[in-house]
Each structure stands twice: as structure tokens, then as C-alpha cells.
């Protein structure tokens, strides 16, 4: 498990970010500066990807990104009003706030990666495509088939070793039925 990101690291990153990127909404700068100046608040700030899944999150975008300038998410409601979100942040300082910053090549940036945390609210199958699910189901079906087949073959060998023709015949039919069902 990754060690938690310290408030000091978050503060340092935000300051660096503000010095290197220009945000599309000036209110975003106010919010980030507010976070920097309130260290106790930074303990509840978590940098994540896909903030839209979080119960309380904010997405801010720099000019070098094509993403929307600003979004604030709270309990499945979305607003683009940065002042309302700033008010919410000030009033609810003890609640976790999840922050997503959009800027050029953010997914490749090591400094951003150092403060990024795993988003605990992303659905388990979020990163799976339909093809991935079909491939996984096919593999699972194949593995179950192989396990059943190997068990029957093992039991057939055992029946042969024991000279049990009746059990051998029964298991051979079972194996044939299993194989023909697999081919359908």
C-alpha cells in the first residue's frame, strides 16, 4: 500500500502547479491558494483521477487542456459555479475534498503522480471494456472446463488402475458428454 500523501507535499505541489500553469477560471486559483494557506484543510484534500465519482470533488483545468474549465461535484449534483464551491469548501472543512487537475500530459507527470491517490469511488469494472469482459468470461469458462476434464481423466485413470470397468465406462461417457457440450 502506498504511504499517505502529507499536507506538506500537497502544499508544495499546489504551489508548484500555480507557478507553472494558468487555470481557465480565476476562481480556481483562489481555491487552490485557499487550500495552500489552510494546512489543516489539506489533510482532507485528495488528488485523484475521475473526480466525478466522488461524493465531494472539484475539477479544475489549465489553459493547455481541452477539458471543461471547472466542475464541482457534491452528492451527485454538479455545478460550474466556482463561488458556490468555494463557499462549500470553507463551510465544510472537515469533509474530504477530492481534486482533479487537468493539464497537458498530467497522466505522465511525475510530480502530479507523487500526490495522486487511488480514487476509492471508481466502480470496480470502470476500466473494463466489453471485449475485456467477454475475454475474461471465455477464459473462466475454459479454465472451468479444463478443471472438470482433468478431474474426470484422473478418475478414469484411477478406475483403470483399480480394474473398475463399470466406473471407467461411466466416466468415459461423462468425459465425452463434457467434451461435446464444450464444442457447442
From Swiss-Prot:
SMART domains attached to this UniProt entry: IDEAL (SM00914)
Database matches in InterPro entries: IDEAL_dom (IPR014957), UPF0302 (IPR011188), UPF0302_N (IPR014963), UPF0302_N_sf (IPR038091), Virus_scaffolding_prot_C (IPR027393)
UniProt-listed Pfam families: IDEAL (PF08858), UPF0302 (PF08864)
Family, as annotated: Belongs to the UPF0302 family.
HAMAP family assigned to the protein according to its UniProt record, in alphabetical order: UPF0302 (MF_00760)
Protein name per Swiss-Prot or TrEMBL: UPF0302 protein OB1778
Amino acid at each position: 500500500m502506498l504511504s499517505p500523501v502529507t499536507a506538506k507535499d500537497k502544499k508544495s505541489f499546489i504551489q508548484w502547479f500555480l507557478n507553472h500553469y494558468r487555470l481557465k477560471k480565476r476562481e480556481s486559483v483562489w481555491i487552490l491558494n485557499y487550500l495552500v494557506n489552510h494546512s489543516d484543510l489539506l489533510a482532507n484534500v485528495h488528488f485523484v483521477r475521475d473526480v466525478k465519482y466522488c461524493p465531494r470533488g472539484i475539477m479544475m483545468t489549465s489553459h493547455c487542456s481541452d477539458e471543461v474549465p471547472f466542475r464541482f461535484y457534491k452528492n451527485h449534483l454538479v455545478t460550474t459555479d466556482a463561488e458556490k464551491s468555494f463557499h462549500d469548501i470553507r463551510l465544510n472543512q472537515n469533509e474530504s475534498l477530492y481534486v482533479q487537475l487537468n493539464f497537458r500530459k498530467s497522466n505522465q507527470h511525475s510530480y502530479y503522480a507523487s500526490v495522486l491517490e487511488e480514487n476509492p469511488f471508481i466502480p470496480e469494472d470502470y476500466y473494463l471494456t466489453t471485449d475485456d469482459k467477454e475475454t475474461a468470461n471465455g477464459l473462466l469458462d475454459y479454465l472451468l472446463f479444463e478443471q472438470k476434464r482433468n478431474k474426470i481423466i484422473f478418475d478414469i485413470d484411477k478406475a483403470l488402475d483399480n480394474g473398475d470397468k463399470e466406473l471407467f465406462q461411466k466416466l468415459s461417457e461423462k468425459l465425452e458428454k463434457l467434451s461435446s457440450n464444450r464444442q457447442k
